[in-house]
Amino acid sequence: VLAEKRSLGSRDGPPHLVVLVPLHSKAAAHNTLRLLQSQDSAVVRVDEGKAGGFALLCPRLKQRWRFVTAEAGDLHAVLDLAKVADSLLFILDPADGWDSAGEHCLSCLFAQGLPSYALAVPGGTDLPPKKRIDARKKLARAIEKRFPDAKLFPLTTEQESSLLLRHLATQKQRHLAFRDRRAHLLAYAAEFVPGEESDLVGTLKVSGFVRGQTLDVNSLVHIVGHGDFQMSQVDSPPDPLSLNPRVIKGQKRSQDMEVQDDSVNGTDEMEEDVKVLMKADPNKQESLQSEVVPDPMEGEQTWPTEEELQEAE
C-alpha cells in the first residue's frame, strides 16, 4: 500500500488522474479549476482543445496530477472516465448538494464500482452566515447517507485547495477488480496514419500512461465505442508531463506560477526519441475472431455399418 501511494503521481509513476464530476446544475466546476490552478511554485499544462483539462506539476511536493472535467449530463462519459480514474472529485452545490441528475449519476457509479473519491463544495460565501450554517448541516446529513465516512472540503481559498490536493495524494486507493485485472489508459494524444491501400484503414497511434496490469503487445486492445483491435508495437515516447519541465528564460519558476499551453501536439512528441519496447509476434497474437464459425458438415451423419447394427440389436 505504501509503495502504491509513493508511485502514484510521482516521477516514476503515472500522473494522479482526477476526474471532476459536477453533481448539480449549479455546481461551480470552473471555480474549482481556477483554485486548483493557483498553486504556488506549480506548473500548469493546459490540454489544448479539451475544455477543463489540465495537468498540475508540483516539483516541490514531487507530485503531478492530471485533471479532466466530465461533461455534465453525459452519463456514459462519466462512467467511462470513472473506469480509468485514480480519484473522482465530486463538485457539490453549497445549498442542495446534488440534484436528481446527480443522484442518478451516483447510483450508476456505485453500481459500476466507485474508485477513490473526494467531496468538494466551491462557493457558498454569498449566503448569509446563518443560512450558511444551516446549509452546511443540511449538506452533512445528505452526505452521511451516501458517503458515511467522507470528509467535505470547502473550496473558497487557495489554502483550502492545497488541503484538497494533499488529501487526494495521500488517501488510500480503492481497488476495483475489473480494472486491476487489465491494463488501461486514458489517451493523452492520438493520431491516425492511413494505410497505403485505403484511407479508411490504417494505424492508430495512441499515447497515454498505462495503469493496472502490464500491457501485452500480443493481446487485444478495446477502444470504447469502436471495438477490439490488434496492436503492432508498443513504444516509449518522452514523458510529456515531466516533473522537471522546460523553464523559459527570464522567468522565476520558484516564485511565479507558470502556465504552459500544449501548443505542440502530443503526437509530435511521440516521434522524438521514441524507443520501441515490444513488437507483436504474429504467431502469438490473440485472434480477433470472437465467435465460432459454423461448419455445415459438422452435423452430418453416415449410415451405420452391419457390425454397428448388430451391436445395437
Regions found by a protein language model. Give the residues of each.
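C-terminal effector/interaction modules appended to NTPase cores
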Residues: 1-86, 196-313
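Helical mechanochemical/support elements of P-loop NTPase systems and associated helical scaffolds
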Residues: 16, 28, 81-84, 101-105, ...
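Short acidic, S/G/P-rich loop/turn micro-motifs used as interaction or catalytic elements
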Residues: 25-28, 92-99, 125-128
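Intrinsically disordered, low-complexity regions enriched in proline, serine, glycine
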Residues: 30, 100-101, 130-131, 152-155, ...
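A generic secondary-structure signal
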Residues: 35, 39, 107-108, 142
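Inter-motif core of Ras-like GTPase G domains
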Residues: 71-96, 102-119
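Canonical P-loop GTPase G-domain recognition
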Residues: 110-217, 222
